[in-house]
């Protein structure tokens, strides 16, 4: 006989022995029930009903990120002559962050204004010529062509003057950007330049963040999204603060799921008035939904059903009694079902023992 055949025979013998054992065990249990002998139940087979607060929990995992942040860029091409802040410095709204060299910018304003003044003078002269040619034309001393040429000169100079005035405004605006100030109070999170450095237009200078309020960007499975609502509270634990929780609330929910993970982004806002938290800290939390206060919930396996409806088996004076129940909410993550018709302190069979029937005498191990 081959080794494979021997293994198959051994497996068959084991399966046959197991099946016989189960049948004999069930037969003994049924025989005990039929003859009124008490059935011995383990402590794990029963539970005592207690009132408790229940809720579904959605796990939130993510990193803290400042809600308000601003990346400042240079709006002029110039040399940095003053840079009074470093990474980590706390600044207030209006504080000076960067000062650029103003000489070239001031010269640009002066030059544009001089050009605008010259065009303004030329325009006034052209307008006077147009007025004189118009009067002469009315007396027949000047032709219509002369008047039209003078009018064209006026219109052209006026257009040039408007363009030059716009250049003056641009130069003045650039001069006003020679100082970069904080738009809001916060902390310098990054700095990309050094004092004395000449930077071109639109160079990234630094990033400022506000730490009073942070958020967690968490991905929640689509199956759990129907449980989530705006303003729901969340209890968060943050790395570096063992034993302490921080409160947050649902601020925003993305309208679409991520194509790859099939998760929906949920943003949890967290107050940080103490200033303890920092961007990038890893956090884990539980979002409690569908809170139910002072309810009795039993394991789903304890709920039985017959032609008369749902019921549980209550151990009363050493005998199993049928207790009809109504079903409420369920908490699938804990395999519990809210029930009515059961009182606090009732001892209920919670193990899946289908052979147990009403009026069966039982004893509970260790009691």
Curated annotation (Swiss-Prot):
Annotated keywords: Nodulation, Plasmid
This protein's GO CC annotations: efflux pump complex
Keyword Heme: no
Pfam families linked: HlyD_D23 (PF16576)
One GO MF term attached to the UniProt entry: efflux transmembrane transporter activity
SUPFAM superfamilies, sorted: HlyD-like secretion proteins
Coiled coil spans: none
InterPro entries: CusB_D23 (IPR032317), RND_pump_MFP (IPR006143)
Recorded superkingdom: Bacteria
Gene3D superfamilies, sorted: 2.40.30.170, 2.40.420.20, 2.40.50.100, Helix hairpin bin
Biological role stated in the UniProt entry: Involved in the production of Medicago-specific nodulation signal molecule.
Similarity-based family: Belongs to the membrane fusion protein (MFP) (TC 8.A.1) family.
UniProt name for this protein: Nodulation protein NolF
Gene giving rise to this polypeptide: nolF
């Amino acid at each position: 006989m081959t080794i494979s055949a021997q293994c198959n025979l051994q497996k068959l013998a084991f399966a046959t022995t197991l099946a016989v054992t189960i049948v004999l065990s069930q037969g003994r249990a049924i025989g005990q029930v039929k003859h009124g002998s008490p059935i011995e139940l383990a402590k794990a087979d029963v539970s005592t009903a207690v009132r408790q607060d229940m809720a579904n929990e959605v796990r939130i995992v993510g990193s803290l990120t400042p809600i308000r942040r601003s990346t400042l860029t240079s709006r002029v091409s110039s040399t940095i002559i003053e840079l009074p802040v470093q990474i980590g410095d706390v600044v207030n709204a209006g504080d000076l962050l960067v000062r650029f060299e103003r000489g070239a910018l001031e010269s640009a304003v002066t030059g544009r204004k001089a050009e605008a003044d010259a065009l303004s003078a030329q325009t006034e002269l052209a307008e006077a010529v147009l007025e004189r040619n118009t009067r002469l034309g009315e007396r027949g001393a000047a032709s219509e062509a002369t008047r039209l040429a003078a009018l064209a000169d006026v219109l052209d100079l006026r257009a040039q003057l408007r363009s030059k005035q716009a250049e003056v405004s641009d130069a003045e605006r650039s001069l006003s950007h020679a100082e970069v100030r904080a738009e809001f109070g916060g902390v310098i999170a990054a700095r990309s330049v050094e004092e004395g450095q000449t930077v071109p237009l639109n160079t990234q200078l630094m990033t400022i963040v506000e730490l009073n309020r942070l958020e967690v960007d968490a991905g929640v499975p689509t199956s759990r999204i129907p449980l989530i609502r705006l303003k729901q509270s969340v209890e968060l634990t943050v790395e570096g603060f063992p034993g302490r929780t921080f409160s947050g609330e649902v601020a925003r929910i993305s309208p679409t799921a991520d194509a790859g993970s099939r998760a929906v982004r949920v943003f949890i806002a967290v107050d940080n008035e103490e200033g303890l938290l920092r961007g990038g800290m890893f956090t884990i939390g539980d979002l409690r939904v569908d809170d139910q206060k002072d309810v009795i919930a039993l394991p789903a396996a304890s709920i039985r059903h017959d032609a008369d409806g749902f019921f549980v088996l209550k151990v009363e004076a050493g005998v199993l009694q049928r207790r009809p129940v109504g079903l409420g909410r369920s908490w699938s993550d804990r395999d519990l079902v809210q029930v009515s018709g059961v009182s606090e302190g009732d001892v209920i069979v919670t193990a899946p023992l289908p052979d147990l029937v009403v009026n069966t005498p039982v004893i509970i191990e260790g009691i």
